[in-house]
């Protein structure tokens, strides 16, 4: 579930980040923070998913209507394969297929801590999960990204400035818990007033 270093752009992105100065990183962060948020992931709970192939680090729906059981996984596919794979349209949305019931289970963990299993996410990520001070927002993010971050923090593969604060939060989470949290947070979008102000 962690970041896959065999994926070509993982190592390229690591090298780019290592070569950046502090000023370049700050400038990049400010640029990306200034981009108006637009929803691009739609979470769909289901028992079956389209059969897919992997290309360029993406799951892409096969031609036809073949399906398979989802099992305990989230499958993210472009809403429009040609727009995403061929035209590289940055506004082409994704569908995140998740197991039935995962959003509700994730809400119990995120909103209430799952009866002591973890910490309420709003404590650090803000009441709408949009971030709080230097702590990033997690609402509306790719569920694959969220699951990878949780897993990497739990396994000790992340060493960022704030990672130590997350260690007790992720310590007791199972892979299914991480899947459920990822499904729930992906299903959340910023409030309408936050969208209009560009937050």
Predicted features, each with a name:
Residues 3-120, 155-199:
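Flexible coil segments in periplasmic/lumen-exposed cytochrome c-class electron-transfer proteins
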Residues 123:
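Short, cysteine/histidine-rich loop/knuckle motifs that typically chelate Zn2+
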Residues 126:
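Short Cys/His-rich local motifs and their 1-3 flanking residues in nucleic-acid-associated proteins
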Residues 129:
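Short functional micro-motifs and their immediate structural scaffolds
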Residues 133-139:
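Short cysteine/histidine-rich zinc-coordinating motifs and their immediately flanking basic loops
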Residues 149:
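Terminal helix-turn-helix DNA-binding modules in bacterial transcription factors
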